[in-house]
């Protein structure tokens, strides 16, 4: 045996030993907080979740995908590995998928849970995306979870179906994937289907999403009663009442007062007890009423200013009273 092959073998084994010895230990970052439930026989794209959490100085040399306990021949890395694609998934493709990012000195991994389900009435609540609008408002319904499919084709054609209300002129698709609903009605609620075409390898695949639209009661704006101005005198005991009326579905509000950059809340005096707030809550005529009383005792010259009653709710409201001293 010549000495040359021995030298090459020695170099090969030494190089392999050094690479193995220097390979960084891979940090397991656990499972991604969101699970993915996708339809059978339709393309699935999963993101590598830890990429967006890596520091800007981290130089990724390699992104690897694997399925725990199975072969990886169904996985197609796309977008330079930052996403993985399965073109025609079956229920056997359900499981845990792992994204591994590495460079010369660092390695980490994170897993995602994928469940593939069939389209059936019994599964519709599992695979639908809930969205909420309010009655008598202008709302929007969005074709969900499609960004990865339209990243290279923002003008992708998206077709809506599945609900008779789509023929109503109040429902208009102004932007691909977004339906604007004018003057929302209760019977707009239900299931809507949006389908987009995804092209890969010269072939076209349908990507289907089902939206479960819920229509909640009309939000009736809260009302506030507060006088525009009050006249008082130095040394007197002054109480200013602010009355906030709420209608369902709005049932609660945080009511407080503001004056000259100072906040006054219930059980929170100005330090010497001269200015205090007391709130009382009661029900009347299907309304929840909060009466907030600002008490100033005794009145001083510095109180000749404005006091704003603020109700922090949806939407928030406020009103200002001017105190004058004679």
Curated annotation (Swiss-Prot):
Record keywords, A-Z: Disulfide bond, Glycoprotein, Host-virus interaction, Immunoglobulin domain, Repeat, Secreted, Signal, Viral immunoevasion
InterPro entries: Ig-like_dom (IPR007110), Ig-like_dom_sf (IPR036179), Ig-like_fold (IPR013783), Ig_sub (IPR003599), Ig_sub2 (IPR003598), IL-1-bd (IPR004078), IL-1_rcpt_fam (IPR015621), IL-1_rcpt_I/II-typ (IPR004074)
Classification via Gene3D superfamilies: Immunoglobulins
Superkingdom classification of source: Viruses
Compartments, as annotated in UniProt: Secreted
Broad class of the protein's primary localization: secreted
Ig-like domain ranges (all copies): 24-115, 122-212, 221-322
PANTHER family to which the protein is assigned, alphabetical: INTERLEUKIN-1 RECEPTOR FAMILY MEMBER, INTERLEUKIN-1 RECEPTOR TYPE 2
Record's function text: May reduce the host inflammatory response by interacting with inteleukin-1 beta (Il1b) and thus decreasing the association between IL1B and its cellular receptor.
Protein name (record): Interleukin-1-binding protein
Lineage: Viruses, Varidnaviria, Bamfordvirae, Nucleocytoviricota, Pokkesviricetes
